[in-house]
């Protein structure tokens, strides 16, 4: 090989020394090294490999490197996604640094070749060859594993320089010793120095083997763990590495104090043994370490300090944090009373169902405060992979525990109040069904052995007080719903919202905006107008935002007035929010025939809806618009069938065969479904056909059957509150829904007039003032005599 002259790119080596005739894979990741490699690849693939004096320091100048290295050629390379390179180099020549310079973000150097000075006589060379072979065989005897191929390779080498380079490159000796051997000019001296270092290595291996043999003889099978630890201690002392020993001791102490059950304890000890024997640079080492950190940080036996339930304190906390909701608070206190009597909270799984902003999540916080327990919340909206619940298996890169175990770790106690927020928003995806994964979490018979895939050992969730929240029962699988006690939270009345605003929202927003109570106040008239003309919701979330906007708007005025107290009055609301968004009375003074006010339930509370009907010449067809679902379409068909069978008894001139009827429910962009609009659709079509308007202050809800019966529906409280809010004065309900009025506040009930009906004839009489005769009251003509042909004779 001819020597390469001129400037050649320099690549620093951290923990290795490359000898001539030796090939080695290298990973190039530092910026200067990448620049040097790219320069070499553009030219002739030659590089100079120099070892760093301090492997832990960055290379800023040539003085940070040893002055003797090797000239090597890049045989192959591959660029990785992160911009680094994996290369394969072969060293050709020892070289000494003459001159260096910085060039294009890397170091280039001129070198001189280091040739062996002086020749060895044949006897000396053979003696050194024999000594190296014998010492190499002795070292291989002390190493574990199959070394046959290495022995055969050494036996085939006849050149002393090649054998010296090979043994120096692969022997487990210090980097500084390898560098010293590389720099020695004479081959004989290099061989003698190498023999000296290999002899030291042999003695060290013999000591280690002696320690291992002695320990194996002294200890029994049940003390293998101590043997391995002692071996690693000796090895680390020889290498000067104490970090691994400290980490091992730390984990051992944590495992002893964690209070794990037997199965988890056995897994942790196995993982600790694997950690001890793993290379700290390997991915497996980091995976085991992360797993052990999770296992030792979980609260296996750490519970909250307060175990006894103080019902009086719990009631006081609930009343402090929430106004109204008396029935809900009573249900919660009953649940806590059962827990107190059982002296256990196993099986404590509640579900709060209600519109946004009614206090579902904040009730969970209050329960945690009342019980003196940690509070953990996990948002489940949009979760579509069961690994989010059960965790990922550790075989995957970037694996993590599931949200349940992660929440328990965050709490630091094994009995927190755990909020599963928006559980109705779980969706099935390609990664599995998270709702099915929740079955094991929420089943009191199974969750004492809940197994997270990442944790890989059972964890007891039976002490956790789970509280799920949802806006609707729709979308929640029945098996999952069956495992929870459902508590409905309906919307607030205007009076309740007024009290909540005064007692909770207004003081809270004043504090958050740096205001004192004596600096800013709001009149009762302004607060009422804010509730009726600028917000319309079941909860109080939008109300809280509006109060925050008032505080922001008035803060500037307070500063300009030099801190003088201000009062928010009715006229100020228009300056802050603009024109009124809602009318206190949504119902008009008059509706045309065919338009009727109905009541609906939505996941965000009750609401009113108008159903419109029109007729035109046709062939008896029914046209339905407004994005109506199948059940609602069937209700319209039943209503039309009832009218076809009954209205001709009232008006014989009605000819349905020559009319097309069109029924529309406004807000056509919103899908609608359910049977509760049955009587509303029937009344709307009857009003249109008889050309009689219905009082807009009259609203109704109820399902109808083909016999004309009015059947009960759900969501009565939410619907009645919405009707009252909209200005309705009379409501038609099924007779069997009369019992549901007990849930409605007294101040709302006394403002409304209720009609309880059992048949559609009663509905038509109340709304249209018509008295449709029943079939048994109709005088039918006598049947005509049958002809002989009709009689079949």
Swiss-Prot record:
Residues 8-202 form the Lon N-terminal domain. GO terms for molecular function: ATP binding; ATP hydrolysis activity; ATP-dependent peptidase activity; sequence-specific DNA binding; serine-type endopeptidase activity. The active site is at 676, 719. It catalyses: Hydrolysis of proteins in presence of ATP. InterPro entries: AAA+_ATPase, ATPase_AAA_core, Lon_bac, Lon_bac/euk-typ, Lon_lid, Lon_proteolytic, Lon_Prtase, Lon_prtase_N. Its EC number is 3.4.21.53. Keywords: ATP-binding, Cytoplasm, Hydrolase, Nucleotide-binding, Protease, Serine protease, Stress response. It is found in: Cytoplasm. Gene3D superfamilies: 1.10.8.60, 1.20.5.5270, 1.20.58.1480, 3.30.230.10, LON domain-like, P-loop containing nucleotide triphosphate hydrolases. It comes from the Bacteria. ATP-dependent serine protease that mediates the selective degradation of mutant and abnormal proteins as well as certain short-lived regulatory proteins. Required for cellular homeostasis and for survival from DNA damage and developmental changes induced by stress. Degrades polypeptides processively to yield small peptide fragments that are 5 to 10 amino acids long. Binds to DNA in a double-stranded, site-specific manner. This is Lon protease 1.
């Amino acid at each position: 090989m001819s020597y390469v002259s001129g400037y050649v790119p320099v690549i620093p080596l951290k923990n290795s020394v490359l000898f001539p005739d030796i090939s080695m894979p290298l990973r190039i990741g530092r910026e200067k090294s990448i620049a040097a490699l790219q320069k070499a690849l553009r030219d002739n693939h030659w590089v100079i490999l120099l070892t760093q004096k301090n492997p832990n320091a960055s290379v800023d100048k040539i003085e940070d490197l040893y002055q003797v290295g090797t000239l090597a050629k890049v045989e192959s390379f591959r660029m990785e996604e992160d911009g680094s390179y994996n290369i394969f180099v072969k060293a050709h020549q020892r070289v000494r640094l003459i001159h260096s310079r910085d060039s294009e973000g890397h170091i280039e150097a001129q070198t001189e070749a280091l040739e062996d000075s002086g020749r060895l006589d044949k006897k000396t060379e053979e003696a050194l060859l024999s000594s190296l072979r014998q010492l190499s065989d002795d070292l291989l005897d002390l190493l574990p594993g199959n070394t046959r191929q290495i022995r055969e390779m050494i036996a085939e080498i006849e050149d002393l320089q090649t054998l010296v380079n090979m043994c120096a490159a692969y022997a487990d000796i210090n980097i500084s010793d390898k560098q010293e051997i590389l720099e020695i000019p004479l081959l004989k001296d290099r061989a003698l120095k190498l023999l000296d270092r290999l002899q030291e290595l042999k003695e060290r291996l013999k000591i280690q083997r002696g320690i291992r043999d002695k320990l194996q003889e002294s200890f029994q099978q049940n003390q293998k763990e101590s043997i391995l630890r002692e071996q690693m201690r000796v090895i680390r002392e020889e290498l000067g590495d104490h970090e691994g020993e400290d980490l091992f001791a730390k984990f051992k102490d944590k495992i002893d104090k964690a209070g794990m059950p037997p199965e988890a304890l056995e897994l942790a000890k196995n993982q600790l043994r694997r950690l001890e024997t793993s290379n700290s640079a390997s991915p497996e080492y980091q995976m085991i370490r992360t797993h052990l950190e999770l296992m030792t940080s979980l609260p296996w036996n750490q519970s909250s300090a307060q175990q006894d339930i103080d019902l009086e304190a719990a009631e006081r906390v609930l009343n402090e944090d929430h106004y109204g909701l008396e029935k809900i608070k009573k249900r919660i206190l009953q649940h806590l009373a059962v827990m107190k009597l059982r002296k256990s909270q196993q099986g404590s799984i509640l579900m709060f169902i209600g519109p946004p902003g009614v206090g579902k999540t904040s009730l969970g916080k209050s329960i945690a405060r009342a019980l003196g327990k940690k509070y953990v919340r996990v948002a489940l909206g949009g979760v579509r992979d069961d690994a989010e619940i059960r965790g990922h298996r550790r075989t995957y890169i970037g694996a993590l525990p599931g949200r349940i175990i992660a929440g328990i770790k965050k709490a630091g106690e094994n009995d927190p109040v755990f909020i599963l927020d928006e559980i109705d928003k779980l969706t099935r995806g390609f990664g599995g069904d998270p709702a099915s994964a929740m079955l094991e979490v929420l089943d009191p018979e199974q969750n004492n052995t809940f197994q997270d895939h990442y944790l890989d050992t059972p964890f007891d969730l039976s002490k956790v007080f789970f509280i799920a929240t949802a806006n609707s029962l729709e979308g929640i699988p029945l098996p999952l719903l069956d495992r929870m006690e459902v508590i409905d939270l309906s919307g607030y009345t205007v009076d309740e919202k007024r009290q909540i605003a005064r007692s909770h929202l207004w003081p809270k927003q004043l504090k958050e905006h740096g205001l004192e109570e004596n600096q800013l106040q709001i009149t009762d008239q302004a607060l009422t107008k804010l509730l009726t003309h600028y917000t319309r919701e079941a909860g109080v979330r939008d109300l809280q935002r509006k109060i925050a906007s008032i505080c922001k708007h008035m803060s500037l005025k307070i500063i300009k007035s030099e801190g003088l107290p201000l009062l928010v009055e009715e006229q100020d609301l228009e300056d802050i929010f603009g024109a009124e968004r809602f009318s206190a009375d949504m119902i008009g003074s008059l509706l045309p025939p065919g338009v009727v006010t109905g009541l609906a339930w939505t996941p965000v509370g009750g609401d009113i809806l108008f159903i419109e009907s029109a007729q035109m010449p046709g062939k008896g067809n029914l046209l339905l618009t407004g994005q109506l679902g199948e059940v609602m379409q069937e209700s319209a068909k039943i209503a039309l069938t009832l009218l076809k069978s009954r209205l001709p008894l009232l008006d014989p001139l009605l000819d349905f065969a020559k009319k097309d009827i069109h029924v529309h429910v406004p807000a056509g962009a919103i899908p609608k479904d359910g049977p509760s609009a049955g009587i509303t659709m029937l009344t709307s079509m009857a009003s249109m056909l008889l050309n009689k308007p219905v009082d807009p202050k009259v609203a109704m809800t109820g399902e109808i059957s083909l016999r004309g019966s009015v059947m009960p529906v759900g969501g009565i409280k939410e619907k009645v509150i919405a009707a009252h809010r909209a200005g309705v004065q009379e409501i038609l309900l099924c007779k069997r829904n009369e019992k549901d009025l007990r849930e409605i506040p007294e101040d709302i009930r006394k403002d409304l007039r209720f009609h309880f009906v059992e048949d559609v004839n009663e509905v038509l009489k109340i709304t249209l003032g018509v008295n449709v005769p029943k079939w048994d009251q109709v005088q039918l003509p006598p049947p005509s005599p049958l002809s002989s042909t009709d009689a079949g004779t």
